[in-house]
Amino acid sequence: MAEIIGVVERIWRYPVKSTGGERLDSVDVDERGLAGDRLYAVRDAAGKLGSGKNTRRFRRMDGLLRLSARLGRRIDGPELFDPLGRPVERPNAFLRAYLQLDDVELAREDAVSHFDQLPVSVLSTATLEWFGEAAPFTVVDERRFRPNILLRTPPGTPPFVEDAWLGRQARGEAPDSARLSFVASSERCSMTGAPQPGLPHAPEILKAIVHAHDGRLDALAEVAAPGRLRVGDRLTLD
């Protein structure tokens, strides 16, 4: 029997990797993920993508989280906004001055995926609200964890309920709803506590996740069947 796990409370898309995103009422979902999500990134001359960490694929570029981006109805290119929310007219020139790096540009995804791990992140309100006890003096907001879907879970749902979804599939009730296949949890890094508009530096957030849940948070999914997701959708597990 299908199990209702919650209601889609918010949908987030991040047109430019590692910058702030945009809230949506609904979104198309294809095999790659949410349409337009992380479709662009700040890329350097070596092909590394701007991020909050240094890895084989990524280059740490402090300050990206203070920026934001949106596509709106467009997929042909993002609008970039500075830390005060003002639109940026010449993104590449702005990024080079803002980051103090002369080899970066805003680039569309090509052969190298812009996703850290898997394309869709789902976070429960039960887990988000747990931080009220785990980090009571910290400003906690889902933007720190950059989910695509914030799912309103029933009262009494335990934190880290996302673990119970792994290995299963979920979809909304509408005939055209996308189907998600939950695979793993995100391994969190210092970006969870990085400052961004309205959210101060908070390193204790990552410490709480490491202590309570081995540094993992959310449920990451692949797209099992394309379709649409909407705020207010009830998601059921198969």
Regions found by a protein language model. Name each.
Residues M1-D238:
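Metal-cofactor-dependent catalytic cores
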